[in-house]
């Protein structure tokens, strides 16, 4: 009896030691993480989160735990950074440590770690360097791409004139125009506005982009290991992404058949040439998977973010006709009605520049940023983040940081104007992110936004079917992306 009692005590002691060792190993493995709400097994902090307002849910948690905290999205453990100081400290001051890429489950289903956007830093580094250089070769940042944007703006103006002042949904007018600019770089040509395949591609992009902002999309980010096997809207998003990938693959096959290594026609040609140059290097990142996925990255990002920002911008200007009138006045004074706007005009147009910046700030297109990952055990403030820890840099919390913006929840162009009415930069303006993984299309997007906005407003006044005070500028969805409400408007010739 005594022996069995001693044996039981010994077994309990061993079990206790094993549990303590396991806890110690877990603590060592996960370092000293920031505080956060206690998670439940598998579902994490799901009960404390509202998938219809994920950004607001996380910001509410930050009120209790501070600007750096830990949250569990289902089984995913995430370190969340809020406010300009924390985000800059991580992505700029400790850029190398935070240069990894975290998960975005909807897109990871297709990309699987390939392509310039959703890959690790080791893979992304040579792809980014190549993409930036090649975009420059095809005119980005130069007069060449400015002329391409001006040409496309001309087609858009004619399309709006053809509506004869009728009330229309501007969504696909804008997306096909913006998409044609990046298409001319990656595919070497533009699409006709009525091309059925082109319109189908735009619907696929819009559908999958909007899915990431929906409550179901946010739920999928938490429980994708289960939901990817279930019926639901996520399956439609997968089909749309597959359709986009197949389209890119066809374009690549066409280019392969007609490639002239001495005369690249577009981004795809340039990548194929680089593949040939490095075909004997087994570690090269220049292979077919990265070609298809990087081209899709550029095509998708180069279409949706700018066109959605413009669509939201039109809604804001109809809500604030006084702002629209001031932009019209500045355009008439600086540019007039007899020539197209040029990118260099913005230096003389501080109010228009401020309005465009405020549209980007207010719309807050990617509020939670793309997830990052620390590339090694990293000391951050008083915490120790283990290698591989996922990080959400909350870009929306930077764009709405009250330390930098006096009316963070309002549309207020004066945020970017000094007391003399001159344009004023802000350290908290980072809609394209910052650090090593900043948006590589930032320069192109800035030029597009200025030239498209000024050209459209040079030619038209905006009219809504609602009175300004009745226009709802709150977003339709806020998840990975911010999606404006669907609306109609009239383009009235000036």
Swiss-Prot record:
Bilayer disposition of the protein: Peripheral membrane protein
UniProtKB keywords: Acetylation, Endoplasmic reticulum, Heme, Iron, Membrane, Metal-binding, Microsome, Monooxygenase, Oxidoreductase
InterPro entries on file: Cyt_P450, Cyt_P450_CS, Cyt_P450_E_grp-I, Cyt_P450_E_grp-I_CYP2A-like, Cyt_P450_sf, Cytochrome_P450_fam2
Enzyme class (EC, first level): oxidoreductase
Pfam families: p450 (PF00067)
Binding site for heme: 439
Record PANTHER family: CYTOCHROME P450 2A6 (PTHR24300:SF180), CYTOCHROME P450 508A4-RELATED (PTHR24300)
Identification of the protein by name: Cytochrome P450 2A10
Organism (species): Oryctolagus cuniculus (Rabbit)
Lineage, opening ranks: Eukaryota, Metazoa, Chordata, Craniata, Vertebrata
Gene name of the record: CYP2A10
């Amino acid at each position: 009896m005594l022996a069995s009692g001693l044996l039981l005590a010994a077994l309990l002691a061993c079990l206790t030691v094993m549990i303590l060792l396991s806890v110690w190993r877990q603590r060592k493995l996960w370092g000293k993480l920031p505080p956060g709400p206690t998670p439940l097994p598998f579902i994490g902090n799901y009960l404390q989160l509202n998938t219809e307002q994920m950004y607001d849910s996380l910001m509410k948690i930050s009120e209790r735990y501070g600007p750096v905290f830990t949250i569990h999205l289902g089984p995913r453990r995430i370190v969340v950074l809020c406010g300009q100081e924390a985000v800059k400290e991580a992505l700029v001051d400790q850029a190398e440590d935070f240069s990894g890429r975290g998960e975005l489950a909807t897109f990871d289903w297709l990309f699987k770690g390939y392509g310039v956007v959703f890959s690790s830093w080791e893979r992304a580094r040579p792809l980014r360097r190549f993409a930036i250089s090649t975009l420059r070769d095809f005119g980005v940042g130069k007069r060449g791409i400015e002329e391409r944007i001006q040409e496309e703006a001309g087609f858009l103006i004619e399309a709006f004139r053809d509506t004869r002042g009728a009330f229309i949904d501007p969504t696909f007018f804008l997306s096909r125009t913006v998409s044609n600019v990046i298409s001319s770089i990656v595919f070497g040509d533009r699409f006709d506005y009525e091309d059925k395949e082109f319109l189908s591609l735009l619907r696929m992009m819009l559908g999958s982009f909007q899915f990431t902002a929906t409550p179901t999309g946010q739920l999928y980010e938490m429980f994708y290991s289960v939901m990817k096997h279930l019926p639901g809207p996520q399956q439609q998003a997968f089909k749309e992404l597959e359709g986009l990938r197949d389209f890119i693959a066809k374009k690549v096959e066409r280019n392969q058949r007609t490639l002239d290594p001495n005369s690249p026609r577009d981004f795809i040609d340039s990548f194929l040439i680089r593949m040939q140059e490095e075909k004997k290097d087994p570690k090269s990142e220049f292979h077919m998977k990265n070609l298809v996925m990087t081209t899709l990255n550029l095509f998708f990002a180069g279409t949706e973010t700018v066109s959605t920002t413009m669509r939201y911008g039109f809604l804001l200007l109809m809500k604030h006709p006084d702002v629209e009138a001031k932009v019209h006045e500045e355009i008439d004074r600086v540019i007039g009605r007899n020539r197209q706007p040029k990118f260099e005009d913005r230096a003389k147009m501080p109010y228009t520049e401020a309005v465009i910046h405020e549209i980007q700030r207010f719309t807050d297109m990617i509020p939670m940023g793309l997830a990052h990952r620390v590339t090694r055990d990293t000391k951050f403030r008083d915490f120790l983040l283990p290698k591989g820890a996922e990080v959400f840099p909350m870009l929306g919390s930077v764009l709405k940081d009250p330390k930098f913006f006096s009316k963070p929840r309002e549309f207020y162009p004066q945020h970017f104007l000094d007391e003399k009415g001159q344009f004023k930069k802000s350290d908290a303006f980072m809609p394209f992110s910052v650090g090593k993984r900043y948006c590589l299309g930032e320069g192109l997007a800035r030029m597009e936004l200025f030239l498209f906005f000024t050209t459209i407003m040079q030619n038209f006044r905006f009219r809504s079917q609602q009175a300004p005070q009745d226009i709802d500028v709150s977003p339709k969805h806020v998840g990975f992306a911010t999606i404006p409400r669907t609306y109609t408007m009239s383009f009235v010739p000036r």
